[in-house]
Curated annotation (Swiss-Prot):
HAMAP family: NDH1_NuoC. The gene is ndhJ. One of its GO terms (biological process) is photosynthesis, light reaction. InterPro entries: NADH_DH_suC, NADH_quin_OxRdtase_su_C/D-like, NADH_UbQ_OxRdtase_30kDa_su, NADH_UbQ_OxRdtase_CS. It comes from the Eukaryota. This is NAD(P)H-quinone oxidoreductase subunit J, chloroplastic. NDH shuttles electrons from NAD(P)H:plastoquinone, via FMN and iron-sulfur (Fe-S) centers, to quinones in the photosynthetic chain and possibly in a chloroplast respiratory chain. The immediate electron acceptor for the enzyme in this species is believed to be plastoquinone. Couples the redox reaction to proton translocation, and thus conserves the redox energy in a proton gradient. GO terms for molecular function: NADH dehydrogenase (ubiquinone) activity; quinone binding. GO terms for cellular component: chloroplast thylakoid membrane. Belongs to the complex I 30 kDa subunit family. It comes from Arabis hirsuta (Hairy rock-cress).
Amino acid sequence: MQGTLSVWLAKRGLIHRSLGFDYQGIETLQIKPEDWHSIAVILYVYGYNYLRSQCAYDVAPGGLLASVYHLTRIEYGVNQAEEVCIKVFMHRSNPRIPSVFWVWKSTDFQERESYDMLGITYDSHPRLKRILMPESWIGWPLRKDYIAPNFYEIQDAY
């Protein structure tokens, strides 16, 4: 079953895949990494002007990584805002997708956190560097195949 946004995108020849609806009735779409930036701009112009959240997760050990965007279409005089969830899957061997920082500025820290924890590179992000872990940290702590170091060093605890 396709939602209204999926039908709208299909009428305009924009490649995507409908993943159905979540428990709240929010439509979920899958977009290819190479199509993500252009579709993000189209969604912004269409009215999805608010990025509610961006996160990322490891689908399975040795499998794909996913970057997830929750967008809201806010219009004056409308009681119920439209929402959509966009998922962009990529191979862990080269996890790269275009940054949408220049579309929604609020992705700044969120894309940096996804980079820091999972190693997803967001091309054209202006400040893509670690935000939670020290710059010297090796590896991506939220990947399911991550092997945690067996030492803990507490510095300046008091």
